[in-house]
Amino acid sequence: MLGLLSTQSVNNAKQRGGRIMDAKQLKDLQSLPLKYKIMISQERIREWYEHWDGQVYVSFSGGKDSTVLLHIVRELYPDVPAVFVDTGLEYPEIRRFVKKHENVVWLKPRMNFKRVIEKYGYPVISKEQSQFLFEIKTGSSEKLRKIRLEGNKYGRGKVSERWKYLIKSPFPISHKCCEVMKKSPFARYEKETGNKPYIGVMASESSMREIDYIKNGGCNFYETSRVKSWPIGFWNDSDIWEYLNIFNVPYCSVYDMGY
């Protein structure tokens, strides 16, 4: 369990008219049948669209999750643009799949992958584990280091036991790759256009995303440093595949190759 939200978080949610979420409520949402999840996601999408007067976009990676999200959004609002960041690291099949879609804005990072790893270090395992390893190897806070090694009082937020040997790796490790190559291009696009993102991430993907989802009261994040909407944030991986099959939505062929 993630524990209760702080009093300040609850008060902030009340003041902005937002939803207050806890771990049990998230689990309840995650256990709903798909048809109800679709209805809730559609409502969150409408709320976001109306709040920003239609100045929105879908963050589109070509992966199955963002493919489902794009399909749901465009069933409601066909003219919403999709935005794809071409990092140069994508499978050729992903690039071909993205090109099949209309109204997609292509962005590029200002720094290539080689330069990123030279400057910041290698992304390993996952973004979350890379961040934890980075903070252990480079951080100055002993309190944070202890959490990353042993976990918080709920046992969360630590490097997995199987990856602790990487603490002594001879090469630098960092989570900065995603920030430089993916997040920065999106941030520039948002600043230039004023458009706010729908993002196809799910709380079930990592403990950090679960914490973010709960802390911010659900799908639509209005008070974070980067405002964003996670309309399928309470879905599970099985829901994605069920949606693709039920609605016969084409998805990238890399998934049929075992990736």
Which residues are covered by each model-predicted region?
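ATP-dependent adenylation/nucleotidyltransferase module used to activate substrates
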Residues: 14, 19-239
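N-terminal amphipathic/basic-hydrophobic helices that include classical n-h-c signal peptides
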Residues: 1-20
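Glycine-centered flexibility motif
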Residues: 2-3, 200, 217, 258
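Mid-to-C-terminal catalytic subdomains of enzymes
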Residues: 231-259
